[in-house]
A protein has these predicted regions:
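Residue(s) in the substrate-gating loop at a strand-loop-helix junction
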Residues: 145
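Short, small/polar-rich loop/turn modules that mediate ligand/substrate recognition or access, typified
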Residues: 91, 177, 182, 248-250
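Substrate-binding pocket helix/loop in short-chain dehydrogenase/reductase
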Residues: 101-102, 109-114, 218-219
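Conserved glycine-rich Rossmann-like NAD(P)H-binding loop of the short-chain dehydrogenase/reductase
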Residues: 36-51
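C-terminal substrate-recognition "lid" of short-chain dehydrogenase/reductases
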Residues: 122-125, 133, 224-255, 260-261
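Active-site helix of classical SDR
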Residues: 125, 161, 169
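Alpha-helical segment proximal to the catalytic Tyr-Lys
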Residues: 130, 174-178, 246
Length: 262
């Protein structure tokens, strides 16, 4: 795992790791945590993570990490603790989309989705727990999805991985609570991200209708009348990482504009 450091953060700053941080929700989460005063290790397989960390500036560190590889995730955490002295927050954000009829799903496509979304979340939580248990404190935030609770046709594998992330979160909150570690899940809804637009393009092609029409149909089903943004998700992660959430653990919080009331 290669790392690239930028300006050192202030001494004793809280330290976070965000996976999948080169773009999309992960980049917005990393930016918010930096503004909150945290030092952030931004991890991704995307080479653009170095440019992203440079763009965010002071306190941002770039790291190459494939979350499907347990050894790389362990190394990411070890490097973070060695260089910055602590780990206060791990945001297991890395994820991929993908879907289609189950009869058409290849073994490789299945393994890719499960490997990143579920294996990656497990390896991340395990590595974070191993670092946080001796410290007697910490916060882990996983990224689920509203489709982990109610999964549409054609998204079975994706939904199954996110349901697994939600279940893992709830179990780890019970398991790690006695060590002072909080574990929560943020479940985005229909977000204005490339992953979501790609899914809608597949839907558009399958139905033979214009992409713009599909986008409007989805938007019409959101009570707040708009797609979500990375800023919306990052705000909830920021809260869960803060002392204001000191008594919040084992929760799955939808960020979906009311699309899936629970």
């Amino acid at each position: 795992m290669a790392t690239e450091a930028h300006a050192q953060p202030p001494a004793l700053a809280r330290v976070a790791i965000v996976t999948g941080a080169a773009r999309g929700l992960g980049l917005d989460i990393a930016g918010r945590l930096l503004r909150d005063g945290m030092a952030v290790f931004m991890a991704d397989v995307d080479e653009g993570v170095s440019d992203a960390a440079s763009w965010l500036g002071t306190g941002a560190f770039a790291a190459d990490c494939d979350v499907r590889d347990a050894g790389q995730v362990d190394s990411l955490v070890q490097t973070t603790v060695t260089r910055l002295g602590r780990l206060d927050l791990f945001v297991a954000n890395a994820g991929v989309g993908g879907g289609g009829p189950i009869a058409d799903m290849s073994d490789e496509g299945y393994r890719q989705i499960v490997g990143v979304n579920l294996d990656g979340a497990f390896f991340s939580c395990r590595a974070a727990a191993r670092a946080m248990i001796p410290a007697g404190a910490g916060s882990i935030v996983t990224l689920g999805s509203i489709f982990g609770r109610d999964t549409p046709a054609g998204a079975g594998v994706y939904g199954a991985t996110k349901a697994g992330v939600i279940a893992l979160t709830h179990a780890l909150a019970r398991e790690l609570g006695p060590y002072g570690i909080r574990v929560n899940c943020v479940s985005p809804g229909n977000m204005a991200t490339e992953m979501h637009w790609t899914a809608l393009r597949r839907r558009s092609a399958a139905a033979g209708v214009p992409f713009e029409l599909v986008v409007e149909e989805v938007r019409a089903d959101i009570p707040l009348g708009r797609h979500g943004t990375g800023t919306d998700v990052a705000a909830i992660v920021s809260f869960l990482a803060s002392d204001d959430a000191a008594y919040v653990t084992g929760q799955t919080i939808n960020v979906d504009g009311g699309y899936q009331p629970i």
